Amino acid sequence: MSKLTNKHKQKNKNKRNKTRKKLHRLKEVDNFYYFVNKDWFSKNVISKTSNVKNAFSILQDKVDKELHLVLTNHIFKEKSPEAKHCKNIYDSVLTFNNELTEKQIYLFTEEINNYRKMECEDGLYKFLAWAKLNGISSPISLHMINDNEHHGRYILSLGEGGLSFSLKETYTDPKKKRLIKAYTQFIKETFAIIFGPNNTYCAEDVIDIERELSKKIYTQEENGDLNKTNMKCTSSQIKHRCDFDFYKFITLFGIKINKNSYKTNVENPEYIKHTSKLMLKEWTTNKWNSFWVFRLLVFASGFHSELNKYFFSFFSLRLNGILQMRPRCDYALSFVANIMNSTISRKYIQYYKNAKQKVFVTELTNKIKCVFKERITRSKWLTDKTKELALRKVDSMSCAIGYRDKYIAEPSCDFSATDAISNFIQFVKWDNEYVIKHLHKKMPDKTYWLRTNEGNVFDVNAYYNRSINEMIIPNAILQEPYVCLDKNMAYNLASIGFIIAHEIIHGFDKLGCQFDGDGEMHNWWSKEDSDNYKKLQEEIIEQYETVSKRDNIKLNGDLTLSENIADTSALQIVEDVLEDYLVERDIFGAEQDKHFKELYYNYATQWRTLMTISRMKILTALDGHSLTNYRVNCTLIRSERFRRIFNIEPKDGMYYNKPMSVIW
């Protein structure tokens, strides 16, 4: 990266100071989010090892430190096979072993050349299967997902892969020429690190292939369209439609299926067809060899000190604005948590179980679901039949809160204390065997905590899984600042209450509404209700895009629609929960308004976020969530109670002059 001159640094500093002064003059009615958080913004900075700072990241740092203690103070002192695996995996990552990693790279390079010598269609499928079994990404990905149409079962899914950038514009937009030029130089130097400066690999060939592959990748909006990403095909149909012999490919994994009846999900048929034709024609050429070897180096970059530094400098520093690498022990922890997930999860719960908070959140979830059902019943735009099915879906929604009693078995591998890359390859092979073993079986029952469905118990996050109709609130988030048992209901509703309601609403957002109470994908809506919902969605899209334009921000209202529906509806639900709570305690009028003011202030506080400009640009282009200032302001703008309490007028920044209907 080029260094900024002192003149440019001073110019940027002056610009930041000018922005801060402007923000400090704001009032509640102008920009509620910045008014509430301006002091916090002025006193906080982003860590050099991150590109964001907010309540989520601060708490996750705390949890990660606890996980380190779980490892060092407890697991490492045990004599069990699982404890030995954890220690060996951790030690292997803690210190780079470049010699062993380079040896593995050279072996894999020879393997690639051996497959290329086959020069036939069978050779391609054997090579793609070999790459998958060893954890090397290729242009066609294969993974196991929940079957949207057959509740409680797994299905294979074919998708896109093998690209460093997920936006096709990156490869074609003239404005991205400097980035592509830098990426080309990065690839050249990556090859040189392992193979020396006079190697035979060509960075321009890698770029050409990635550019060609990117022509048929989906946009972010298309990736969110289930009509495009949810196509079930037999192996015979895949071969006919996509020119890809899936049956031949899958049998190389030892998976037995009926080519004329077993269905696989194809996420982007045109991409698979385009890529398959391209590979069948050219995959053994020297041009494609550069691409394959670069994907190998991408795979190996986490295990080689020089590659690791260089990949950080491009992807983390240049593209994401992260100034400094995290300590190696953090990567070692992540590696152990990924491979020995059940052991880490059990021990984390043993020593950091938030049991009282789990009881509180379970009770609060039930209250929120009751209020949501009342709102569905009162809805003015839903017909009775759709209301009935919506209510049934709420009743059927399961909630995984905190932790569960059972976890899946750990990998039965011989992990080394010195060879991280071999450890990872062993794990990938075990994981592939796990997929093969469970493909034709039902999912484990809901007494198991499944990280494939429910994330990790140590994630500071929350989820909704539409294919099993389940909300997930991991143990890690069941603590301050999200759950505070010694604080009032206004505080807890603004934090964990909002999160619960938000995840529940995901069952009814743009995507969630296409699944029934059993998690099966089919249309349970009347045409009238479906048409009305689309009109309401357009209203949300227009509001968010209009408000963001005031700040010269181009927010994609369609990309962020589902999250915006969840945000706006969740706030209105927790408002109702708080009102019921206060009425039960005979709190009305001005005294009640004080509690609602506290709700709104706490809500804005929970979402305060500092981020680098690089991260903001990436989120605006790729993320389904709106930037946090719009998550707060656009949501509050839609609240009738908020507008009344703060006396929002047409001259105010928190005013919006178009219809804002109640959705959920």
What positions do the PLM features span?
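Short, solvent-exposed loop/turn elements at domain surfaces
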Residues: W40-N44, F165-S166, P481
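Short, surface-exposed beta-strand/loop micro-motifs that present aromatic residues
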Residues: K22-H24, S141-N146, V460-Y464
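Intrinsically disordered, low-complexity linker/terminal regions across diverse proteins
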Residues: Q60, V206, E212, S235-F244, ...
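Noncatalytic, helix-rich "gating/capping" subdomain that lines the substrate-entry/channel surface
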Residues: E66-K367, R404, W430-D431
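Active-site-surrounding "flap" and adjacent substrate/cofactor-binding loops of secreted or lumenal enzymes
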Residues: K18, K27-D30, F35-E102
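Hydrophobic/aromatic-rich, well-ordered segments within soluble, folded domains that form packed cores
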Residues: K22-S42, T170-A192, L561, L571-I573
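Arg/Lys-rich, intrinsically disordered low-complexity tails that mediate electrostatic binding
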Residues: M1-R20
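Beta-sheet entry/capping signal
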Residues: N31, S141-L142, R153-I155, N461, ...
